[in-house]
């Protein structure tokens, strides 16, 4: 399963155009979909997650859940993304063999090295720009991406990325970018997706 390109991370589920935005971006070419929801109760997350998984599979892209082994299990998602305050990598690796495990490595190259050795399927450095998605996001020096080519697993950039600043990241040998607001808050999510993909052709 290829892990590269444009990685869409959702906002928390909400009533309204949530699924329309996701499908519009998937139909425009998003390569990976992650369901990230920090606020809703599990019954809502499960219901929304099932619909998102169906959409991801409709467009033949991997479906990842954020930080929850419970959702990974119930939804039988393709994988999970974890950070420093989430369940331990080793537990997830043992409990869910064969699942994709992605790890946030912030601005710490040694974390990236550690998790590659432990068997992570991809890592994500960031935040590179101010982001409204995560108020307490640690800012990351863009020069860390000079090390991207040293890894044998995909390296993603994340955090405050939009169609105006993404070119700064594409100078480096990354595998892709992860975005939230740049698509969810776009006037035209499909057009924003296509703009990102056109720029990503430089590295794909």
From Swiss-Prot:
Cofactor note: Binds 1 Mg(2+) ion per subunit.
Organism superkingdom: Archaea
Binding of 2-[(2R,5Z)-2-carboxy-4-methylthiazol-5(2H)-ylidene]ethyl phosphate, residues: 131-133, 160, 180-181
Cellular component terms (Gene Ontology): cytoplasm
Keywords for the protein's UniProt record, in alphabetical order: Magnesium, Metal-binding, Thiamine biosynthesis, Transferase
Annotated EC: 2.5.1.3
SUPFAM superfamilies, A to Z: Thiamin phosphate synthase (SSF51391)
One GO BP annotation of this record: thiamine diphosphate biosynthetic process
MF annotations from Gene Ontology: magnesium ion binding; thiamine-phosphate diphosphorylase activity
Binding residue positions for 4-amino-2-methyl-5-(diphosphooxymethyl)pyrimidine: 34-38, 66, 104, 134
Biological function: Condenses 4-methyl-5-(beta-hydroxyethyl)thiazole monophosphate (THZ-P) and 2-methyl-4-amino-5-hydroxymethyl pyrimidine pyrophosphate (HMP-PP) to form thiamine monophosphate (TMP).
Protein family: Belongs to the thiamine-phosphate synthase family.
Name the UniProt record assigns to this protein: Thiamine-phosphate synthase
Organism in which the protein naturally occurs: Picrophilus torridus (strain ATCC 700027 / DSM 9790 / JCM 10055 / NBRC 100828 / KAW 2/3)
Gene field: thiE
